């Protein structure tokens, strides 16, 4: 079984002006919830078990997706109050288990990553965290990372400010052993990017990244949400 945790518990406040009364992953794109497009892609890549970490208006997600989506098993963990991306990971990891790696996905990001290639790279280097990276062309929009030629993450925040740098694409192949020493527990509110990654880096956990050139879009801002309706690939949406 190949499992993925989808971080879908955010409030989506930046998108509220154009998508009201819906959790962000349920925002309609080409007549269907964005979450369906996300699940379709990763099912195509071989994922057959999803855990959705949900919070704001979670009933709408659970009622729509259910416990089985196109043959993939769907489970849920519910954030009774917003826990942040790190808190969602801690909660979801309990459901999946601590003995084998799994995929971690941002619920508002579509990034066409080759899962087989991501896993192979992680296995070769025995990573705790394997990041999927993309080339950010918008200066100042995405925080770049300093990466060695071998893929080792030397810094979580790049000192380079111009476009064309490698940035975090919000898709990770992750081994839950990495959580044992970081100092956060299930139920804690924390950020994956600011808290958990920072702690993992300080502990010298194996953090590496590999670049992918597949389609990338983050629907967190109204401008990009409108763009998604035109650009999200359709080959996995039927």
Regions found by a protein language model. Give the residues of each.
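Conserved beta-strand termini and adjacent loop/short-helix elements that scaffold enzyme active sites
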Residues: 55, 77-79, 132, 156, ...
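A conserved hydrophobic helix/loop-capping motif in glycosyltransferases and polysaccharide synthases
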Residues: 5-9, 27-28
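Short acidic-glycine loop/turn motifs at beta-strand connectors
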Residues: 146-152
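Short, high-confidence coil segments that cap the C-terminus of an alpha-helix
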Residues: 47, 99, 126-127, 204-205
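Catalytic-core segments of class I nucleotidyltransferases/pyrophosphorylases
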Residues: 103, 110, 116-123, 137, ...
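A short, conserved acidic/glycine-rich loop-to-beta-strand motif
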Residues: 125-135
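Short catalytic helix/loop segments, enriched in acidic residues and glycine
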Residues: 21-34
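Conserved N-terminal catalytic core of the sugar/cofactor nucleotidyltransferase
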Residues: 2-6, 14, 32-106, 115-117
């Amino acid at each position: 079984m190949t499992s993925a945790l989808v971080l879908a518990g955010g409030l989506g406040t930046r998108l509220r002006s154009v998508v009201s009364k819906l959790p962000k992953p349920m925002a309609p794109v080409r007549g269907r919830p964005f979450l369906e497009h996300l699940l379709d892609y990763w099912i195509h890549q071989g994922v057959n078990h999803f855990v959705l970490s949900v919070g704001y208006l979670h009933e709408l997600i659970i009622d729509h997706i259910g416990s089985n989506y196109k043959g993939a098993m769907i489970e849920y963990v519910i954030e009774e109050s917003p826990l942040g991306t790190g808190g969602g990971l801690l909660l979801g990891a309990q459901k999946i288990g601590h003995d084998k790696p799994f995929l971690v996905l941002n619920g508002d990001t579509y990034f066409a990553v080759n899962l087989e290639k991501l896993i192979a790279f992680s296995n070769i280097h025995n990573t705790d965290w394997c990041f999927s990276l993309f080339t950010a062309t918008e200066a100042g929009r995405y925080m770049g990372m300093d990466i060695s030629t071998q893929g080792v993450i030397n810094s979580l925040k790049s000192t380079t400010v111009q476009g064309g740098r490698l940035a975090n694409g919000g898709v990770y192949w992750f081994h839950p052993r990495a959580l044992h020493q970081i100092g956060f527990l299930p139920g804690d509110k924390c950020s994956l990017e600011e808290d958990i990654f920072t702690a993992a880096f300080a502990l010298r956990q194996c953090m590496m990244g590999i670049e992918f050139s597949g389609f990338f879009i983050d629907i967190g801002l109204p401008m990009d949400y409108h763009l998604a309706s035109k650009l999200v690939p359709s080959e996995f949406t039927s």
